[in-house]
Amino acid sequence: MQLNIAKIYISRLLLFLIIINLSACESVIRGKEYILPGERENILIGSANIKLAKSFDTIQLSEPLVTNRWISSDRETTNNKNNIAFSEEFIKKWSVNIGQGSSKLNLSSVSPIYIGDALFVVDTENTISSVNPDNGAINWSKSLFPEGEDPKIGFGGGLFANSGIIFFTNGFGELYALDPYNGDILWRDMVSSPVRAAPIADNSMVFVLSVDNKINAFDIQSGSKKWEYSWFSDTAGLVQTSNMALFEDKIIVPYKSGEIFVFKKNNGNRLWADSVNRKNIKNSLSQIKDITASPVIHGNLLLTVGFQGRLIANNVNNGFRVWELPISSSITPVASNNYLFIVSNDNILFAIDAESGDVLWTHDINSNYEFKNDNKIISMQILQNKLYLFLSSGDLIVHDPKTGKLTDILKNKIEGSTIPPIIVNKNLYVISNDGELISYR
């Protein structure tokens, strides 16, 4: 009898040790986990459980900004679009075909950029064009993909402009540095895997994040590699991906694993890390951990949201977790003055105090608008003190950012698109699904 009891105790002890080892497995694979300071509360899953602030001062936005450039898909290296000046007339000025449009298997994904006196756009077959923003005339076009490859296969990537150079990445893992005036290739390099996100650059280096969670840093003039950093690669993810950000001497990198890393941009030393993944999901294996909305820098705050994770705010300098909310989103949020606006994956619109994380108001978009077929929100912008939601159908939903009240629904106001529009010099530019670049004022 005593022998049987001893066997039972030994079996239970072995089971306990196995569980402990399994729980530590992720730390073994990924390396040491850095637990950042800051409050962490157990929260329920779903934005419906969020409580509103009891009272708040009237929301005041910053003055509308007249933009004269748009160097990345999210305007600047901070990924914050702010409150942008626009005529709000949405009158079509011109339209020009830029190449192959979207198909069911190959959606347009590269956002246009605007620098100097030209727009730069890419079609679904990796043809980049320079376009005159006044009349839509094509200045030059160039196909950029490896010889012998099908250009439709290398989807994704993006554009970025800095230091008089246009940088372009594609799904073949190529990085090009181009002369903006004639499209001449200044230099070209390759990374180890396909690239779905746009590159980002300062005055000395350009950075590329590939789908295998590896970041590469290249000299902006010569193309020589300066450093690289590899991280755990999560195979479960989405085609859509977010952009990196730059802040002072730091580069902010969102990974497909749901983690956000901050590096010293000159040498790749990791400064701190955090995660948007929720710890209380019953089956974490079913969670898509991607960060598809770009991280936004607003003041000293880094604001990051996961596709099925949460919205977190960190001090960008030291990683201190300031606050978090159970909000998931694939749309890059917008900050203006001291306020953050975000739309969740279940189409709930939020206004948040950026410093405290207090939710000031919410609005359920589904209560006023029926999403049919594949129609979805592709972008959120604050234009001329109004909160615009751009839909893939070309519809626009307009809210008052001070109260969240719906003010207008504009049906088929612009051409349907899968790419967020850009706004420069009070003109709005859209790449339509059929490969047309259209200018609205």
Question: What is the predicted role of each segment?
Answer:
Residues 21-24:
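C-terminal motif of bacterial Sec signal peptides marking the signal peptidase cleavage site
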Residues 35-51, 57-93:
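Blade/loop signatures of beta-propeller domains
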Residues 116, 123-124, 163, 170-171, ...:
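Structural signature of WD-repeat beta-propellers
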Residues 132-135, 179-182, 219-223, 265-267, ...:
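Short loop/turn segments that connect beta-strands within beta-propeller blades
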Residues 64, 93-113, 141-160, 186-203, ...:
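Extracytoplasmic beta-rich repeat domains
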Residues 26-29:
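Bacterial signal peptide processing site
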